[in-house]
Amino acid sequence: MKRKTAVKWLAVLAGAGLLYWGNKTYLNVSPKEIRVWVLSFGVFAPLMFIGISIVRPLVLFPVSVISIAGGLAFGPLLGTLYTLFGSMCASAVSFFAAGLFSAKKNGHYERLEAIQKQMEDNGFFYIFLLRILPINFDFVSYAAGLSNVKALPYFAATAVGIIPGTIALNVLGASFLAGNLPAFFMVLALYIVFISLPFIFRKKMQNLFQESN
């Protein structure tokens, strides 16, 4: 790795570390606190919620907290719809920001080369699996932005892949307020399906890894 590239990545890591520290120190808020703040905007609450969802990846704020807050603030149906829309916008921000920063057409980055190759070779299916797996949402978005993966399969895979987790977290958030036991078991069932999918597609995943080696 060239010295200039190494310095750039050290700066990125330092910036990420600073953002993480600031997040934990100043943005360590709960879903209930987000709910109260968002609903204070009245009829503009949905717009504010979508707005913070869009800027969230820029400050490395956990997507799970936002998703639960969506269920708390708007209920399982509207909360899920607003969270899905906000998450798609956030994934676009991360994807294009990473692409602009890295000048992605000029090559690969050693640390991410295996993931980049998988994304480029297998497109929709690989990104879909990464979205299904309990992997950091923004890591997948930034990794895709650093690769040569096309925008259409990236967004299509993201839209489909985030549905199970988004529904589960929003229903969980809504059940906190309602004290709804059936909703809790519904979330539990969704999570069982959610974590089982990688095992169901295990053979396909192994084939993908073998093809890239």
From Swiss-Prot:
Q: What subcellular locations does the record give? A: Cell membrane
| Pfam families named in the record | VTT_dom
Q: Name one GO cellular component term.
A: plasma membrane
Q: What is the lineage of its organism?
A: Bacteria, Bacillati, Bacillota, Bacilli, Bacillales
Protein's recorded name: TVP38/TMEM64 family membrane protein YtxB
Keywords, comma-separated and alphabetical: Cell membrane, Membrane, Transmembrane, Transmembrane helix
Looking up InterPro entries in the UniProt record yields: TMEM64, VTT_dom
Q: Is Manganese there in the keyword field?
A: no
Membrane association type: Multi-pass membrane protein
